[in-house]
Amino acid sequence: MKIIVTGFDPFGGEPINPALETIKSLPKTIAGAEIILVEIPTVFDKAADVLEEKMAEHLPDAVLCIGQAGGRVDLTPERIAINQDDARIPDNEGQQPIDRTIREDGQPAYFSTLPIKAMVEAIHRIGLPASVSNTAGTFVCNHLMYQALYLAEKQFPKTKAGFLHIPFLPEQVVDKPGLASMSLNDIVRGVEVAIGAIVEYRDKEDIKKGGGSTH
């Protein structure tokens, strides 16, 4: 089994991105699966171009995109990506699309095809906080998740795809009182077991366990 795992470069004035630091720390094999690590530019459209090239090169069984969600307290597999860019801040090339459709021939939204409930359960088992998220935002993270699922539908039908948001690292919140963080070691541990769940549930339906929200 081959799994592409992506991480974004720093953006929004941050000197580091925990997603990129995380993938740099991952082993090349997890639960018997070959892990293909890909750095992604935090740039609309270009992010998808890089991913599409790597998917065509490696024909992975799964794609797990990882991104920074500053302010979140836990590891959050995303349930859904929407067909809309609405950038509050510019990307790393100064683009700031507002209310733009990502793919004219794409679905209004795509659900993750990864076992998000099993991923959360696996992270909980090692004593780390995790929950299913129902919004990936409208910046480049949602953009890339949507593009990954679009590409899977249109070009790579055997590939499952999804997204995992992770908190800030401690060094990123030194001057941000009240914001949560998680150590790189814990994030990496959580990502590893989440990938293990992807491998375990490759040919199985995700577990049925309450993980929704009331608002």
Curated annotation (Swiss-Prot):
PROSITE patterns: PYRASE_CYS, PYRASE_GLU. The active site is at E78, C141, H165. Its main location: cytoplasm. GO terms for cellular component: cytosol. InterPro entries: Peptidase_C15, Peptidase_C15-like, Peptidase_C15-like_sf, PGP-I_bact-type, PGPEP1_Cys_AS, PGPEP1_Glu_AS. GO terms for biological process: proteolysis. Disulfide bonds: none annotated. It catalyses: Release of an N-terminal pyroglutamyl group from a polypeptide, the second amino acid generally not being Pro. Keywords: Cytoplasm, Hydrolase, Protease, Thiol protease. Signal peptide: none annotated. It comes from the Bacteria. Belongs to the peptidase C15 family. Homotetramer. This is Pyrrolidone-carboxylate peptidase.
